Amino acid sequence: MIYHTLQYVLPWAEAGILDVDANNDVVKALGKDTFAPGALNMAKKGSKIAAVPVDGWTQMVVYRKDLFENADLAPPTSYANIVAAVEKLSKQNGMFGFVAATKTDENFMSQVLEHVLLANGVNIVKKGGIKKQGKKLKEALEFYKVIAKASPPGELYWKQSRALYFAGKTPMIIWSPFIMDELAGLRDSAPPTINSDPTSPELASKTGFITNFSGPSNKKGAAWADVRYFGITADADTDEAKQFIMYSMDEGYTSTLSIAPEGKFPVRRGNSSDPEAFTKAWSKLPVGVDRKAPLSDLYDPDVINNIVAGLDTANRWGVKEGELSRASKVIKSQFINRITRLYIDDQIDVDEAVDMINKSLAKFK
């Protein structure tokens, strides 16, 4: 049995390394409807689930709930809502409306862009090849330019976005959940600077998280997720492996998640007796480095539920098509980052950007 990342599920299933039937049996025994749909969909091989989802995390729009409420703004669940907030909150008290990733050679920009493009239904691959881009990509790039123009000048990545949010200089960033303990002043190497006390939970109490947001061409939206799986292999002692997974995903599931709660969201929310049992237990697990506190002490129940809900619509380019490898090569080449930056910097227009991306994509057929 192997604990592995999403990228190996379908290739290993196709190669016969995973015992798809055994893994599917475990999911059925635990209760398919107790798992986050997104985590299951990404592991689908035909009508079966090729590996058992264990845990995951989703990228998040991190935002100042207090500023949104004071300005009578809707939460940042869509391009339109984010643009409205940028327009209203930019320059307010010296604030930048957003801190978008603009450093083209940083994986952080690739990750943020994929999330933004997925939100509008953009997919760069299809089964057996590359997908030509059009209106959806154009809309996504236009949106990204708005948030980039509302950002400080320079080469921006995770470091600046976190620092500016912690200093109260921006109402919105996109980040991973590993920011959650830092927001609450539990990590001395990355303290909030919104007030004079670096251990204060004030910023955490004013922060909301959105994992799933949408563009105009994809009303249901999407969440960018990193999900991990248990895979029973073809040469495993099947009965022993099944028993281990059944225990780890039921009686022992809270212990499984406790290894790193802020990076291990429960993909299995509960069981037949309580559909939210594991979400509740997870929220009470201590997080932090220099100090510890449970997430439920730091964040309201609606915030916790928003975080976990992202796994319902979890997605990544190439997963459903069995083309994750091709999509990864495209992402690692970073040409989408570079062309997007040319557009942000007004060196090309949006139609030229779409055309250049299509020409570059064609090299990966």
List the model feature ranges, each with a label.
Residues 66-76, 92, 123, 150, ...:
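Short helix-loop capping/hinge motifs at secondary-structure junctions, enriched
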Residues 46-54, 59, 81-129, 136, ...:
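Extracytoplasmic/periplasmic solute-binding protein
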Residues 3-8, 158, 175-180:
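Beta->alpha turn/N-cap motifs
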Residues 79-83, 154-167:
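Short helix-initiation/N-cap motifs at beta->coil->alpha
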Residues 5-58, 83, 109, 198-211:
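Hinge/lid segment of periplasmic solute-binding proteins
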Residues 183-184, 200-201, 216-334:
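C-terminal lobe and pocket-closing loops
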Residues 86-88, 127-155, 198, 202-212:
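Glycine-centered hinge/linker elements that transmit conformational signals in sensory
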Residues 1-35, 66-77, 170-172, 187-193, ...:
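Extracytoplasmic "Venus flytrap"/periplasmic binding protein-like
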